[in-house]
Amino acid sequence: MGKPPSPTRERVLDAALVLLNALGAERATTRLIAEAAGINEGNLYYHFRTKEAVFLALLARFETEALALLPPALPGGDRLAPYAALLSGWFALTRRFLFLFRDAAFLQQAAPALRPRLRRLSARLLERLRAVLAAMEAAGLIAVPEALRESLLANLAIVSGHWASFLALQRGVRRLTPAHLAWAEGQLRALYAPYLTFRARAQLAATGQPAGLAP
């Protein structure tokens, strides 16, 4: 069995995540992270020698949770609800790790070690997303023409991965509210909407939801 994680290390990561989301990756210094965790900088350096090391540890946390949310074995059956739950779960997760998305440009410049990790994770998540589309098609919930499948996949990945940075850059949003999550889910539902089958639309009509994946 592996060595159990240090409680202090986990407390530092918990505090760092809150601070990074609130202040941004650029403004959150190691001194502020240590203060938020209730320790001095010397103790922080015992666990994380650099701010980049904190970023990497939080990315590892996110990766574990993201891959658990989108497992290789996807929901069976012909109901839309499990896929809607995946959608809501994804946006809740990205809100919790907001700094990774909102501050992506700074992170890749300031923490070069993140770049290959982010690329690998992005590729893995793209394949999981491809599997979601395939499962929805097999369940008779969507029908996507072969010629449009890769374009839909790319647009789903762009919206699901960059919605927070769009809000930050275009609208100056730094702190996300439930309304922002609802907006982001709506953008993704709009991409699915043209491809929903009669079966899926009937399920939405029964719940009073508009076309798209029900929130």
Residue ranges of predicted features:
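Helix-turn-helix
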Residues: 11, 19, 23-53, 57-61
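N-terminal positioning helix adjacent to the helix-turn-helix/winged-helix DNA-binding module
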Residues: 8-15, 152
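Hydrophobic alpha-helical connector segments
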Residues: 71-99, 153
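Short hydrophobic clusters on alpha-helical segments that form packing/core surfaces
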Residues: 12-20, 66, 90
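C-terminal peripheral helix-coil segments that are non-catalytic and often amphipathic
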Residues: 131, 165-215
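Secondary-structure edge/capping motif, primarily at the C-terminal ends of alpha-helices
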Residues: 70-74, 101-108, 136, 140, ...
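Hydrophobic/aromatic residues within well-ordered alpha-helical segments
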Residues: 51, 58, 62, 66, ...
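Amphipathic alpha-helical packing segments from all-alpha helical-bundle domains
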Residues: 113-139, 150-165, 182-194
